[in-house]
Amino acid sequence: MTMMLAFGASWLGAVWFWRSTNRVPATDDLVLYLLVLPLALLAAFWLGRKIYSGISMPAAAATSTAAAQPAAPVAPPRGPSLSLVAAAVRAPHGASPAELGATLAENKARPALDPELNDAYGYPVMSARIADIDADATRTEMSDWLAANHMAPHYSDEQWRALSAGSEVVVELSAYLGAHPLLELHAGQVARREPLSLPMLQLQPVWQADWKPEHRQAAALWFRHLVIQSGWPEDRITVAPERGAVDTEAGTVLARLLSNEPPALAMLVTCGSHLGTGSVERLENGGALFSANLPQGQIPGEGAAGLLLTDALQATLLGTGGEHPQLLAVSSGRLPHSADQSKRANAELLQELSAKALHDAGREASAIALISADTDHRTSRVMELMGVASEATPQLDPGVDIFSVGASCGNCGAVTWLTALAVARQEAESRKAVILCISNLDPFRRDVAVIGPAAAVPV
């Protein structure tokens, strides 16, 4: 009801004002009055409720002085963890996790009217575009390599944009591997046929759902080629086997990596772009493209993100003088019905997954310093995220301590959440605190990850 009142009052007031003044609203007006204003009203309501609860709770506690003193809480056992040695992103509002995190903190990152794409009525669509992607250079270099290796997949223009961003991420992460101290020993061990000390690098791509098998296979081999070009031995890298639809779910891939027998060294990378005529037409034909008439539609985005994950030994060998943030736990689930079709937001599943992830990580919700999410501007997703924040982390300020990557960088499938994870790693490192990373962009799938700092955090 609160959500309906906030959005209803804002929209009706804006429409009445524009009609009474005979004014045609600009794009900034649409974003401000149809999105920003109602969300600000909701945030103010939640903040007021939190302040009221903080005042009333001590008074309620004073009425039960006879209660027995509770025993000190026992920290739940922790499962396996992986060190997040490095992260890389290419996003519309940042070419690194630190740059993107700073922009999100300033609340200045917003989509804009696209300079190239129009809807069916000829109006520019709202998008989140990376300005400096050099797709032509990637197309030329990769096409020559594909021809030399007898592969000829047909990539669309938007796929070339994705591959350009993804290639930059792979090259950046590969540079960290060059510091491995066992690289110099490897060639000698191979020549002498001795047991190899250098670990096997597992390259794990996460794909867009509409990429065909031939697109995925060629791109995976291209990324492998880039890692080898950066100096990593060809015999110490393997591409994870294809698993079909599972390869589009970053949460499933992370959970598998975070198993009882995690790999010693893994590179997780994803890339995508929805900034093409085909993607815009699909969204528009499905009644899912954001416009002035459909403010709950999706805003297409693009980008790439990657993580370099290792066990404790490899993290020490690759260390740069300090320890690394940890991926402590991942919890995933599916909604019984599409969130796009539900009449009201339901945060129950996301709350359960958050509680489970925190339990598996051995952390309390009170230790969380920030939430990094792939949530976009849509009311259903915002309300779901705020439902988790208000229940599990009342200590957080929704306007300051929650980063919504999707609202700033648009919708780009797995890229959006992996970008949020990269930002979470950066914040865990800089704040030396626990970060909760949430995914609720998909209509059905929900994921929660817990990122911890290098040092132990009191629970």
Task: Give the positions of each predicted feature.
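Conserved "HGTGT" condensation-loop signature of ketosynthase/thiolase-family condensing enzymes
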Residues: 1-263, 270-272, 283-459
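Active-site-adjacent substructure of cysteine-protease-like catalytic cores
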Residues: 274-279
